Every structure is written in structure tokens, then in C-alpha cells.
């Protein structure tokens, strides 16, 4: 079996480590016994990935729950029975200096791969709680806003305590937050999800499986 990646120039590779990183970036998604030739657009996508990875690392290491590079948008959900919008879903975006707005399909896989997703989720939870507080102060009646979490985050031993502290710090009721979880893929994940669902229920938090 083989994978062949051809480059028309490698001027920006300063050492062997950078070359391996470049090669793996293009080779990993390839099928076996195949080859590809890289052009200028491919090099740009590699550099964009490097920049995005560096920004995600900085966001995670900085640790601020108020990081301005992470944005939350609340998308209203219509209640067809009541005929109004009474819930919403929190959507995450990044706004970076060199690239502008970045959508989840570009940064979520990188964040999960490199272990940064938990910090992003806690930032979104914090900003969602703040948005709920602002909605309430302005007289909007929202039953709850859902926030997405990945299965991998649930195994963090501090997950529930961090979740609880963020919600309480923002002064919102637990029932105004809903947690949307990725569907479990094996028995181990199923047990973990079930345990967390029961913990959320004890707090008054509604949970959904995506």
C-alpha cells in the first residue's frame, strides 16, 4: 500500500518536522494506493490550518471564558404548537484577525483532535448564560437555550463542577439551559452519557441526544 504526495516546491519547509507535518496534512485523508499533486491553493489551506490550530491553542491556554475570538449566536426555534419562538440553540463561531469569521466545520474537528474542544464549550456555555440573562432583562420569554457538548468532554472528571459553577456564576436557572449531546457509539459511551444525563436531571437541566 502507498500514498504519494507531490509538491512543486517546499521553500517554506525549514526542517524535516515541518515537511512531515505538511505531508501528513495531505496524506491522511487520501485513500491507499493513490497520489495527489499540491498547488498554491493546497499550500494556502495548509497554512490556514496552521494558523487556526495556533489560535485554538492560544484560546485554550489563555483560559478566559470571555475570549472575544469565540462568538455565540442564539438561533431561535419555533414551537409549532404554541405558534411562537420559545427556545433557541447556541451556535459557535470564531472571529479571527487574519481570517475573519470561521464556521464550526473548519475548527471543531481541529479542536477535538488537539484537545481544545472542552475550553471552547465552556466559553460558549458562559456566553450563552450571559445571553439568557440579557434576554430575561429585556423581557424576552425563552424557556431554554441548548448548548452542544461532545461525548469526549463528558469523561472530564471536572466537567459537571465546571458546568455548575458557570451557570451559577451567571445567575441563571439551570432549567433555562439544555444540553445537546452527540449520540453514543458504544457501550462505554452509553454508560457515560447515561450517568451524565442523570446528573444533569438532578440539576434541572434538560438533555437531548443529537
Where are these regions (language model features)?
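Conserved ATPase "switch" residues in P-loop NTPase domains
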Residues: 64, 136, 201
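Catalytic core of bacterial c-di-GMP phosphodiesterases, primarily the EAL and HD-GYP domains
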Residues: 2-16, 39, 82-87, 116-192
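C-di-GMP signaling machinery
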Residues: 10-71, 111-115, 153-160, 193-194
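Active-site core of bacterial EAL-family cyclic-dinucleotide phosphodiesterase domains
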Residues: 42-110, 148, 209
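Hydrophobic "anchor" residues on beta-strands that sit immediately upstream
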Residues: 71, 144, 176, 206-207
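Short beta-strand/loop segments at the ligand-binding rim of alpha/beta enzyme cores
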Residues: 197-210
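Conserved long alpha-helical elements within nucleotide-processing catalytic cores of c-di-GMP signaling
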Residues: 24, 105-109, 118, 198
Amino acid at each position: 500500500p502507498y500514498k504519494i504526495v507531490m509538491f512543486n516546491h517546499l521553500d517554506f519547509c525549514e526542517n524535516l518536522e515541518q515537511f512531515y507535518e505538511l505531508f501528513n496534512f495531505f496524506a491522511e485523508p487520501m485513500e491507499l494506493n493513490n497520489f495527489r499533486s499540491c498547488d498554491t491553493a493546497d499550500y494556502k489551506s495548509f497554512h490556514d490550518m496552521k494558523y487556526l490550530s495556533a489560535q485554538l491553542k492560544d484560546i485554550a491556554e489563555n483560559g478566559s471564558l470571555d475570549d472575544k475570538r469565540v462568538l455565540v449566536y442564539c438561533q431561535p426555534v419555533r414551537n409549532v404548537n404554541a405558534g411562537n419562538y420559545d427556545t433557541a440553540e447556541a451556535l459557535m463561531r470564531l472571529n479571527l484577525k487574519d481570517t475573519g469569521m470561521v464556521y464550526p466545520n473548519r475548527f471543531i474537528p481541529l479542536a477535538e483532535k488537539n484537545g481544545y474542544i472542552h475550553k471552547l464549550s465552556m466559553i460558549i456555555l458562559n456566553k450563552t448564560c450571559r445571553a439568557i440573562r440579557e434576554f430575561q432583562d429585556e423581557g424576552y420569554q425563552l424557556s431554554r437555550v441548548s448548548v452542544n457538548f461532545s461525548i469526549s468532554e463528558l469523561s472530564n472528571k471536572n466537567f459537571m463542577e465546571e458546568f455548575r459553577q458557570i451557570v451559577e456564576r451567571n445567575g441563571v436557572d439551570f432549567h433555562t439551559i439544555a444540553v445537546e449531546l452527540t449520540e453514543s457509539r458504544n457501550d462505554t459511551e452509553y454508560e457515560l452519557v447515561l450517568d451524565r444525563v442523570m446528573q444533569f436531571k438532578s440539576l434541572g437541566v434538560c438533555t437531548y441526544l443529537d
